[in-house]
């Protein structure tokens, strides 16, 4: 199997494309010190020296490394784990198995209930249709957290988390787009 590698705007992350489905339940992120991970490929990649985060998108895997390490020393091990996983006949990394979805929802960061109103619905619609696809191309994800007093709070995940250019993307891209389409939005901040 040929796993393609794409660079992201974040020098500490790489996007791995196995050419197969990765997640059927939406984007999901795991951190190295999370003891509750029930996804075998996440555990295997995070057990490699220098990896600190693994992020599964629909058809890609983003891996974040420690800042002082070199990708050339790490890529082979990550690709090897991905190839090994799929060569054993596994179809997807994160499937729609309800038990697994429950496990994942318990291990993912604290999800707050989404406020229900027209502005929030419009924010989520724009995030889903215009912003998330662009962020996914860079190996990341953006999720809505809250809207209060004109301020939209979002969470950046995957390669976007800790990326040097994420503040510029947030202000010049996300904020400008949301303010353009939704007059009630005055600012966008990340948690």
Task: State where each predicted segment sits.
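Domain-level signature for proteins that mediate thiol-based redox and metal-cofactor handling
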Residues: 1-191
């Amino acid at each position: 199997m040929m796993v393609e590698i794409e660079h992201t705007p974040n020098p500490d992350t790489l996007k791995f494309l196995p050419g197969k489905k990765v997640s059927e339940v939406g984007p999901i992120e795991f951190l190295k010190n999370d003891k509750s991970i029930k996804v075998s490929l996440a555990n295997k990649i995070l057990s490699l020296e220098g990896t600190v985060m693994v992020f599964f998108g629909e058809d890609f895997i983003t891996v974040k490394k420690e800042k002082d390490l070199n990708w050339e020393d790490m890529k082979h091990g990550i690709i090897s784990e991905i190839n090994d996983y799929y060569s054993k006949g596994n179809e997807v990394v994160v499937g729609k198995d309800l038990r697994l979805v429950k496990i994942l929802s318990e291990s993912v960061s604290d999800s707050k209930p989404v406020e229900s109103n027209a502005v929030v619905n419009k924010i989520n619609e724009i995030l889903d249709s215009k912003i998330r696809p662009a962020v996914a191309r860079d190996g990341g994800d953006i999720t809505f957290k809250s809207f209060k007093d004109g301020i939209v709070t979002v969470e950046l995940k995957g390669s976007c988390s800790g990326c040097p250019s994420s503040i510029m993307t947030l202000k010049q891209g996300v904020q400008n787009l949301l303010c353009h389409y939704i007059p009630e939005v005055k600012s966008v901040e990340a948690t």
